[in-house]
Regions:
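Membrane-embedded beta-strands of outer-membrane beta-barrel proteins
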Residues: 185-187, 218, 261, 277-279, ...
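Repeated loop/turn-to-beta-strand initiation elements of outer-membrane beta-barrel proteins
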Residues: 136, 164-166, 193-199, 225-231, ...
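Transmembrane beta-barrel strands of outer-membrane/channel proteins
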Residues: 140, 168-172, 185, 201-205, ...
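Residues that define the transmembrane beta-barrel architecture of outer-membrane proteins
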Residues: 150, 179-183, 212-216, 255-259, ...
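C-terminal outer-membrane beta-barrel translocator/porin domains of Gram-negative envelope proteins
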Residues: 294-449, 453-455, 499, 507
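Outer-membrane beta-barrel "beta-signal"
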Residues: 187, 476, 501-513
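Outer-membrane beta-barrel initiation region
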Residues: 49-53, 58, 64, 69, ...
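Transmembrane beta-barrel wall of Gram-negative outer-membrane proteins
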Residues: 211-317
């Protein structure tokens, strides 16, 4: 008993001393770096001052803070850990004839006075230089200030042309009612009315039979990283013949107009990307007809108009436990605010009623890893929605295909409630050459899963679908003008339209001119 009391007293004293030590330890650092610094300190509690300074600097350099300075000092019993990452200084832009100087700096995410991260700067520069009409040659000029911190000035020499970027893409992500193939032709135009705005125009069709599907789309993005806004509109027209069997001879035709607005407004106090409000609305005006027999007798004619406001929160965070990657999340809801017409809803489903709302959630983590000496990265994604009542088809969660569960048909299953998950490992990019084109190719391996279910008395007891798959593929970029993706998924669960182990290939290629 005496031994137990002594041990307890010792632990209590150690706890008090630990708390006292923490109270006399302070970190002086830009707010953006403090989460990263504290994560490191949590994982390295027993380092000496010299070891702490050296190890933390090496860690931050690996995180991209090339010019970081770390020092540990003690004054009057207080230990101060000071981190000076270096900051973005003066930027000089020259040579640009078409693109605005502020727009170029915004694309490079250059903001004077903010911490300088070389990895982020390199990625932003590479992303901008992928466009045919602009090339930015960067010359960094670090200088040391009176307090020892590095100020990174930069000269940007720009060669630009008229900022037009035509593109064409081919993919097999169409639904099974059509040929399954899609061709899209489009044009992206920068700085139409203001710096850093983009106008995108595109036309999509089924290349096997354009009469089965044609779609027009336009979007205009404007604003800055402090307040990004987008307006969009489109129209689609489709007609599918013999959708059930040639003997029944049932054709379905439909057309629809849609338009909307979306915006993202950062509200993070420390890092603007850490928290933001997203909001907007969509307007849908849909019409569909069903024809029967060789004479194409009209059997059904439906119209549906929906106005769908939405609001939510989204954010970004540094992965915990000393990991080097980032995490992303969003939480929001979509509703018709009781503006729908019950008569139109009842034609689609007698159980549908206006006033529905749909909560949605998404979560993703990206983390660089090294496996068996090979560098790569892991990406985990999860998104879903929930509803306790039946929803219009356009609001149901879909699974299957390249965007959710690979190995299955595109948008094979729908549900009022559903989720999809993806775990993907990507290897380091490798340089290669195909048909005389130089580029980079990256191998990927994945596991996908998804589940949807429907609500209401019209839904059967087993009106739910689950999917699982694994697979591999490659993604590549050639001459900064062509992107290619080739992925093969193997289903691990039977569905109504896809048997287990019946592998499916997902392909897409995009050319920019």
């Amino acid at each position: 008993m005496k031994s137990f009391c002594i041990s307890s007293l010792t632990l209590l004293l150690l706890s008090i001393l630990s708390i006292h030590a923490q109270d006399n330890f302070r970190v002086v650092s830009p707010e953006q770096l403090k989460p990263t610094v504290f994560d490191f300190l949590d994982d390295h509690r027993n380092l000496s001052d010299t070891e702490l300074s050296k190890s933390l600097k090496e860690y931050l350099v690996a995180q991209g803070y090339t010019f970081v300075l770390v020092s540990v000092s003690k004054t009057a019993g207080v230990t101060t850990l000071q981190v000076k990452p270096g900051f973005m200084g003066k930027a000089k832009v020259a040579g640009n004839q078409y693109l605005d100087e502020d727009g170029i700096l915004d694309h490079l995410d250059w903001e004077t006075g903010q911490p300088f991260n070389y990895s982020k700067f390199y990625n932003q520069t590479s992303r901008l230089n992928r466009y045919r009409f602009v090339q930015v040659d960067s010359k960094l000029k670090p200088v040391r200030g009176h307090d020892g911190e590095i100020q990174v000035n930069a000269d940007f020499n720009v060669e630009d042309q008229l900022p037009l970027s035509p593109y064409i893409s081919i993919s097999n992500d169409g639904t099974e009612q059509s040929s399954g193939w899609r061709t899209r032709v489009g044009l992206e135009i920068w700085e139409n009315f203001m710096p850093n705005d983009r106008l995108n125009l595109s036309y999509s069709l089924d290349p096997k039979d354009a009469s089965q599907l044609s779609s027009y789309f336009a979007s205009y993005q404007f604003g800055s990283s402090d307040f990004t806004q987008t307006v969009y509109a489109g129209y689609s027209d489709s007609e599918y013949e013999n959708v059930t069997s040639s003997s029944l001879n049932m054709d379905i035709a439909g057309d629809g107009f849609f338009a909307g607005y979306s915006a993202v407004y950062p509200i993070g106090l420390v890092d603007p990307d850490s928290l933001a409000v997203n909001f907007g609305f969509s307007y849908l005006d849909l019409s569909s007809q069903i024809y029967l027999g060789n004479n194409k007798l009209l059997a059904s004619d439906e119209d549906l108009t929906l106005f769908l406001p939405r609001i939510g929160l989204q954010g970004k965070f540094a992965n915990p436990f000393g990991l080097r990657g980032d995490g992303f999340w969003s939480l929001g809801a979509v509703s018709d605010l009781s503006s729908s017409d019950d008569n139109e809803l009842n034609i689609q489903n007698p159980e549908l009623e206006k006033g529905f709302w749909v909560p949605k959630v998404s979560f993703a983590i990206v983390e660089p890893v090294e496996f068996l000496g090979a560098k790569g990265g892991i990406k985990f994604k999860l998104d879903g929605q929930a509803s306790s009542e039946p929803l219009p088809t356009s609001l149901k969660k879909s699974i299957g295909g390249i965007a959710s569960v690979r190995g299955y048909r595109e948008r094979e299953a729908y549900g009022d409630t559903g989720m999809s998950m993806s775990l993907e490992y990507s290897m380091m990019s490798e340089k290669t050459s195909i048909f005389g084109l130089d580029g980079n190719v990256q191998n990927i391996f994945f596991y996908d899963a998804g589940y949807v279910s429907n609500e209401g008395v019209m839904a059967s007891v087993n009106d739910s679908t689950g999917m699982q798959s694994f697979g591999a593929g490659l993604i590549g970029n050639f001459e900064e003008t062509a992107d290619i993706s080739l992925q093969v998924g193997v289903p691990l669960a039977d569905t109504l339209n896809t048997p287990m182990h019946d592998a499916r290939t997902h392909f897409s290629i995009n050319f920019r001119f």
